Swiss-Prot record:
The lineage of its organism: Eukaryota, Fungi, Dikarya, Ascomycota, Saccharomycotina. This is Acireductone dioxygenase. Its main location: cytoplasm. Fe(2+) binds at residues 85, 87, 91, 132. PANTHER family: ACIREDUCTONE DIOXYGENASE. It is found in: Cytoplasm; Nucleus. Changing residue 151 to A: No loss of acireductone dioxygenase activity. GO terms for cellular component: cytoplasm; nucleus. Keywords: Amino-acid biosynthesis, Cytoplasm, Dioxygenase, Iron, Metal-binding, Methionine biosynthesis, Nickel, Nucleus, Oxidoreductase. It catalyses: 1,2-dihydroxy-5-(methylsulfanyl)pent-1-en-3-one + O2 = 4-methylsulfanyl-2-oxobutanoate + formate + 2 H(+); 1,2-dihydroxy-5-(methylsulfanyl)pent-1-en-3-one + O2 = 3-(methylsulfanyl)propanoate + CO + formate + 2 H(+). Its cofactor is Fe(2+); Ni(2+). One of its GO terms (molecular function) is acireductone dioxygenase [iron(II)-requiring] activity.
């Protein structure tokens, strides 16, 4: 089951560490950000969600040091994932093995990050337009099923004034202002 809490915002230590401030959050609080969490005991449950949400494509990513040509390439990829960004499409991940952290911006306190620890069986859906970042835990491994409505793509738009003015970002702000 996913663990959700306020990130401690300590930037002087390994971002793969838990960074738990001690302030736990509920799944209802996460839902107010448009983030959907489900525990799925098996892939059949994931398939049902895919059918309901009209996800037509999928792939599996295995992120660990052995997946890259060198430790430097691995660390570079982790740094890329950890840059604050958004997507124009939902980001849907089902953790098959290992663990990772998805950090999402707290809409009510924008200087805060909300950290979600996902482990095997956890499915997380981030809405289009939400600023977020990802990293592994110190175990340095996650195998995840990625679901897509259309052709598989992963286009990150790093946070900037230009990203703030995108229609997808404005739509996201309108969505969370409903709560």
């Amino acid at each position: 089951m996913v663990k959700v809490y306020i990130h401690d915002n300590k930037v002087d230590s390994d971002y793969r560490a838990p960074h738990n401030s001690g302030t736990e959050l509920s799944l209802d609080e996460l839902a107010k950000l448009g983030v959907i969490y489900k525990y799925c005991a098996n892939e059949e449950e994931v398939n049902e969600i895919a059918r309901q949400r009209e996800y037509k494509n999928r792939d599996v990513v295995n992120i660990c040091e052995g997946s890259f040509k060198s430790e430097a390439e691995f660390n570079e990829k982790l740094a890329t994932f950890y840059q604050e960004h958004l997507h124009e499409d939902e980001e849907i991940r089902y953790c098959l093995e290992g663990a990772g952290y998805f950090d999402v911006r707290d809409a009510s306190t924008p200087e805060n990050w909300i950290r979600c620890l996902v482990e095997s069986g956890d499915l997380l859906i981030l809405p289009p337009g939400i600023y977020h970042r990802f990293t592994l835990t110190t175990s340095n491994h996650i195998k995840a099923l990625r679901l897509f409505k259309d052709e598989p793509k992963w286009q990150a738009i790093n946070r900037s004034n230009q990203a703030d003015s995108l229609p997808v970002r404005k739509d996201y702000i309108a969505l969370i202002n409903q709560y």
